[in-house]
Curated annotation (Swiss-Prot):
Ca(2+) binds at N116, R165, D174, H208. It catalyses: Endohydrolysis of (1->4)-alpha-D-glucosidic linkages in polysaccharides containing three or more (1->4)-alpha-linked D-glucose units. It comes from Drosophila ananassae. Residues 350-370 are annotated as: Disordered. This is Alpha-amylase 1.
Amino acid sequence: MFLAKSIVCLALLAVANAQFNTNYASGRSGMVHLFEWKWDDIAAECENFLGPYGYAGVQVSPVNENAVKDSRPWWERYQPISYKLVTRSGNEEQFASMVRRCNNVGVRIYVDVVFNHMAANGGTYGTGGSTASPSSKSYPGVPFSSLDFNPTCAISNYNDANQVRNCELVGLRDLNQGNSYVQEKIVEFLNHLIDLGVAGFRVDAAKHMWPADLGVIYGSLKNLNTDHGFESGAKAYIVQEVIDMGGEAISKSEYTGLGAITEFRHSDSIGKAFRGKNQLQYLVNWGVSWGFAASDRSLVFVDNHDNQRGHGAGGADVLTYKVPKQYKMASAFMLAHPFGTPRVMSSFSFTDTDQGPPTTDGQNIASPSFNSDNSCSGGWVCEHRWKQIYNMVGFRNAVGSDAIQNWWDNGSNQIAFSRGSKGFVAFNNDNYDLNSSVQTGLPAGTYCDVISGSKSGSSCTGKTVTVGSDGRANISIGSSEDDGVLAIHVNAKL
């Protein structure tokens, strides 16, 4: 009997453990959130940029039909009308083609899935032509009726876990995930995406759903589609949106047994450090001692689509593309450090926090335009195409799983460390120059700094660093330089 129970427990553990595997193709790391991009444009980006530059995956905006709202704000994508795959980003055929094309070049697709709720009042018409009556909780495109929802009540007290999970988030009709029919429709939706070749999901508003109900849903998912290059038996990577800054009734620890979580404390803490509110020397023990979830349970980011707008967690300390020098430094630190699964934000520029993506006519999303230096125009920021960020994805791929060694700091805001003997990075966030002889851990030779430039044949378009036979190098980062970071690795040796 004990043996039988042990086997069952081990089987359940195996299922759970698989949800933390990113399913990345070998030798790749780093996910990018191509926020509000169209499917055809993402497919081309996988082939032309993400694949060649070593990115491992793309988080895409919600794929299912959403309510059409006046002035087309970004958040209409988070107001589901049905689970039909028709949005401003494209239809099911375009989505399926994108997933295939991205998988073919080693770039995985992760879908932002919204199944905590359906559209709020006023969301009567969808992007796929479906109609709904949110006031009577009728969504015939699924179909859902009032029987499938929790009673109407508003969330006003985040110290009441029952209210947070059973009431409505800003008027969004709250589905009852404990209802077997609701579970069935959600699983049907997710399994359809798995059939189409996705590698995993970001689960929106996970803290507003009961962990036990999510466990039933996740446990009902198919294995990933081997026709798309996934290993037999591979399970979807699940990252749950759980904002836990402490002091609330709901804790991320309730969810980390089911999958990874969005580690908002990482965003808050890295913002404080690179904004100068916390000295960089204290990053020496970056990780769980900062209150983060375990490394394989943490999706980490500098900013996300919510908190760059002041929504969610982090407030004024969150770094965004609007503070480019510090943003690039924080992104470089995240990508250089082994902690967590990093996600790079790729934004559109905005002045109004409700503003939707660039359009051609006020309705249809515009494609990004690309400049000769790889940057974007046409209202798209494309942080993932900034040299200081995409070259650090290359750094992360070059250093692999090598541990942090050779930590150095000046007792203030100048720090450096190596990743084993494969990579070295240094930062200067002080208001005076960094000029020091530092142990890099790297083999002797001349290296190209991948922040200021790129290796091109046997030359470098930026700074070079000469490492001596003892592994030391003279590191120089002026306080007035455009970039407060320098990075070298074995694949950038000249």
